[in-house]
Amino acid sequence: FIIICFCLVNLSQKSEVLALTYSENHNFVSSAAKNVGPAVVKIDTERLVERQQFDPTLIDPLLRDLLGEQGIAPERERGQGSGVIINEQGLVLTNAHVVEKVDNVSVTLANGNICDGRVLGTDPVTDLALVKIEESNYSSFAPLGNSEDLEVGDWAIALGTPYGLEKTVTLGIVSSLHRDINSLGFSDKRLDLIQTDAAINPGNSGGPLINSNGEVIGINTLVRSGPGAGLGFAIP
């Protein structure tokens, strides 16, 4: 009877340890997302683009002279991406291709507030950009990790606003490191990328890739889709 009781107690203790271990492993994604989520923003952009409404060579010269420039009307071209606040002054790190050559930038914070954004600079070679939001002393900013410490197989969590869906979190692993962007068909870039199987979709561009400690280890930049699951890539 004593031996049976001891075995039952021992099994119970092991079950508690296993349950605790599972709980801790199960919740690291939630903890990491809560740590960085308040610093993730949606970026909406707008630029005026002149589009020719007709081919002037196909119109009678007299009518063309009468219309003048009326056949060319500016249109508003809208874009959308993600970003992450990296300090309390409201500096947002994002992709250059999200905000370059735009006329207006609007930043939606995690709390729903919408701020005007000002592009401080873009680097098309590394596809990175800095945007300043006009809200001082913003307390929610993401801690930066060290991508040099990454190993293949480490957890990778992608945050952003794919297709405009805010506060989206996906989980995967680091599938490869130092992936040459030229091998993906971008000869004008100089990057070696983090490859991940965490789901990255249009609108995720500029959002953070974070580790299990809730630190930013990369900026999501592109996805290569095809048969089966897509491949995601982030700038370390």
Language-model regions, residue ranges each:
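Bacterial N-terminal signal peptides
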Residues: 2-10
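Serine-dependent protease modules
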Residues: 15-236
